[in-house]
Amino acid sequence: MKIFKVLLITLMLLANTAFAAEFSAQVKTSEGIVQGVYDEKYNVVKWFGIPYAQQANREKRWALPQKAEKYTGVKDCSQYAPANLQFNGKNVIGQEGVLTLDVYRPDTGENNLPVLVFIHGGNNQTSNSRLWMGEKFAKEANAVYVSVQYRLGLLGFNNLPALANSNALNDSGNYGLIDQAYALEWIKKNIDKFGGDANNITVSGFSAGGRDVMAMLISPLFKDKFDKAISFSGGLTVADFAESQKIIAGKLAPLVVADGICADEKDAAEWLMQGSEEVRSYLMKLPGERLAPVMAGALIRMKSFPHLYGDGKVLPKEGFAAEKFNSVPLLMLASSDEFTSFLARDPYFKNRMDKVLKDKLITEEFVFANKYGSKFYGFFNGQESAEDIYAKYKAPIYVCMFDFGHDPAVVGETYAVKTGATHGIFLPFLTDQSYPYTVGTDVFAKSGPQELSDIFIASLAAFIRTGDPNNALLPEKWEAWTPQNRAETVFDADGKQAKVYQRSNDTSYDGILEELEADNSLNADSKNYIIKNILNGRWFSGELDTKYHNEN
């Protein structure tokens, strides 16, 4: 049986090399030889599921990543690795502690290509390295693209006292972020074998991954691990260390009660706050399938799932008020309808989405909630982040706004209202898929979106090469952000052509709050409910919650 499996793998690998190739799909890494696959459609080579560290399960749970084991022979990297353990809203899927990465590169003889590393989103609770499939980008940007998997949810972020072991890195509880640092070390050591330039690495991330990237800018752990940074819809978030411990203990308390250790949740939470071996043993023995659903569905609320702890070692206790930054050229992207995807999953709208555009009041409520939620969230992901770090940041900052998705003539009325320029709208412009959007690939195949895709990829390609996104396809210069110009480049398109232009964005929290206060387009009860129950407690809601005395 073993001989048959070896023969089968050998035949499969030979089948993938049956046509002329310029770059070998067999690459010798620090752990051994990995065998990738050729993609004739895109003319790229790709490797899936390369371990950058040992699987962090069993006794390695809530421990620092450990050096990947060496392997003999040829490791088949033609199939995706499992996702990390997570709750997808219905079921627990994946495996615990999958620390792997995927690599894509053009099938050419070129070396010293720029490297783009991607940290996937999903609130640091869900998703996997396939969120952004890299074939199109690797080919058109002529770059090496790497997508990283890291520990998620409470398996990736947990700072309860019982898990401390007197190692400051481990005691931070930021295991998922430390995984990313370890992945960047592996990439720096090995990427030249894939034709990448180890001295030209850009780290990027979307949503939670974007917030992770922004956190890297203040983390001593990430010093000299990358040369440029891109944050796609990721603002500035750091959780208070002590408060996070209390929240996590409270969320795990029902499991302790269910297991008969404590009589009620109050006692259970107090027990979990002990730094005892008894608590540690209990946590280590908990099945991952029971841990994954805890705190699920946080939907950009830090108190629903605290992570990125300001521990004083991995992340400064003072967060982004820190004096020192890992200052590298930085590009930040926001979208003009960031909030629609979160509204669609909010308990209030989740079962009412089919009535949007059919029921007058529900439509008005949705439009109102999206208008202000997206104004706040878009500002948080771009302009506000630039404002907050500019004085201490010693490298250029570029800001852009994706505005595609509003024109019913291009995307249809339903998509224009319910989705618009939603959180992650940039992704279909980097792939040939509409995923994760249901509008369909025919929309993105129109000449306008295709031209926009060309310009966007060219801008990212220029940035990862030089630290400056300007290129021949841009119709006007993309200015670096300053407090004086507040410059951002807008990316949009109609059905026939791209619409890319520079503008000054003078949005402010005070301005949005004043507009919201004066807006009487919605009845008072609905307006009050949305402010106090839908817009509250989000990454961007601090000033809103203070003004309206919201619970968060």
Short names for language-model regions:
Residues 313, 391-397, 434, 438-552:
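Alpha/beta-hydrolase-fold serine-hydrolase catalytic core, especially in secreted/extracellular enzymes
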Residues 278-450, 459, 466, 541, ...:
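Substrate-gating cap/lid region and adjacent catalytic-acid/histidine neighborhood
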Residues 2-9:
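Sec-dependent signal peptide recognition
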Residues 82-273, 315-344, 395, 453, ...:
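Serine-hydrolase-like catalytic core of hydrolytic proteins
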Residues 21-110, 283, 474, 514-518, ...:
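Catalytic-loop region of hydrolases
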Residues 11-18:
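Hydrophobic h-region of N-terminal signal peptides that target proteins for export
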Residues 45, 95-99, 178-185, 211, ...:
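A structural signal for well-ordered alpha-helical segments within the folded catalytic domains
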Residues 151-153, 204-208, 401-408, 475-482:
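Short, solvent-exposed turn/loop segments enriched in Gly/Ser/Thr/Pro and often Arg
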